[in-house]
């Protein structure tokens, strides 16, 4: 089953009220707590970590996102988007028109980050500050189309942080509900069409369920376990960890398509966070590459140096 967002009235016409045992197909982010929780987790993980400086840098960017979210709320009428999107995700990155709000968000992020920046980070922020709107749009399009270049990787986390804020705000404004329908392409976010950063096996009311966390709009969509999140095959799956079988972070590899995605288990550690713990477990990525697998997800603070399919 794939996931589609439909207008509330259509859902009410076609479905009975939620039954016991119903699995929520889609979870929208709670932006009031998302960034503060992520920043806190990044700072926790940075302590005595080989990548501590970079995790601390990432925490600073996330804290800036929290401040900019508060100072620059998005006011946008998306009432017709669901009706116009058809089979596509309503905020499809391939076709949804970006407006100037994301430029405002980027400028605000730069303003928040510059006072504490130095060296290469400060130079990158200043270069972004000088960039024309056309240059920014071209770089944004390249990132969203997965056209990565090593020479632009220093700018990518900041541009993506602004784009992510923009899409996450829009996702929160969608006037509809999600339902599971027959279909394919479940490896892509049903809200915006981007790809996951990691998968989270949850606690609470969704205990034991796996949700893929979008690396752009921050939504999470249900994906059954013991099935490759990239090609949906289940015959050649293996699970890898650095510590033990009880590790809170594992890589799920697929011998059929040759890719892997990290899974974070809240039952093993309730503090795990989709972006933070994925970034802090880079050693596991190195191990998976040594085993011949390629990553099927992208962390917003760790972009490839070349384009991917």
UniProtKB/Swiss-Prot annotation:
Keyword Metal-binding: no
Subcellular location: Cytoplasm
Statement: the UniProt record of this protein carries the keyword GTP-binding: no
MF (Gene Ontology): ferric iron binding
Any one annotated GO CC term: cytosol
One Gene Ontology biological process: protein maturation
Domain of life: Bacteria
InterPro entries the UniProt entry points to: FdhE-like_sf, FdhE_C, FdhE_central, FdhE_N, Formate_DH_accessory
Keywords for the protein's UniProt record, in alphabetical order: Cytoplasm
Main location: cytoplasm
Family statement drawn from the similarity comment of this UniProt entry: Belongs to the FdhE family.
Job description of the protein: Necessary for formate dehydrogenase activity.
Name used for this protein in its record: Protein FdhE homolog
Lineage start: Bacteria, Pseudomonadati, Pseudomonadota, Gammaproteobacteria, Enterobacterales
